[in-house]
Amino acid sequence: MKDNQTEVESRSTDDRLKVRGNKVGKKTKDPNRPKKPPSPFFVFLDDFRKEFNLANPDNKSVGNVGRAAGKKWKTMTEEERAPFVAKSQSKKTEYAVTMQQYNMELANGNKTTGDDEKQEKAADD
């Protein structure tokens, strides 16, 4: 027993400190599920990262790139952000279509693997 604790209190404290394993009802992620589309900022970040790395080839810090991108994004006007917003919207519509196809395949019981899709693309080429 611990200092000034009864046996019951001691046991309940020990039970709370135990490491818990995986939750019983936790779902695993489907590797074939389409990735969510990027936000306008992340579309901007892809372009900005390329420019930043060309301007600062000796920079190894990911944080510096993110900080600089965030500062620039905050100072941009709506007109400057418009191409990134448009690209993000087009990716959202593509995502909606691919998710609809994915959900139809799941409903039909056809789970496709990435290997099958790669083989189909290779056959088309």
From Swiss-Prot:
Chief site of localization: nucleus
InterPro entries reported for this sequence: HMG_box_dom (IPR009071), HMG_box_dom_sf (IPR036910), HMGB_plant (IPR031061)
Compositionally biased spans, kind Basic and acidic residues: 1-18, 113-125
Gene Ontology CC entries for this record: chromatin; cytoplasm; nucleus
GO molecular function term, any single one: DNA-binding transcription factor activity
Tissue: Mostly expressed lateral roots, root tips and flowers (including pedicels, but excluding ovary), and, to a lower extent, in cotyledons, hypocotyls, stems and leaves.
One of the GO BP terms on file: chromatin organization
Family statement drawn from the similarity comment of this UniProt entry: Belongs to the HMGB family.
Reported function: Binds preferentially double-stranded DNA. Confers resistance to salt and drought stresses.
Protein name: High mobility group B protein 5
Species whose genome carries this gene: Arabidopsis thaliana (Mouse-ear cress)
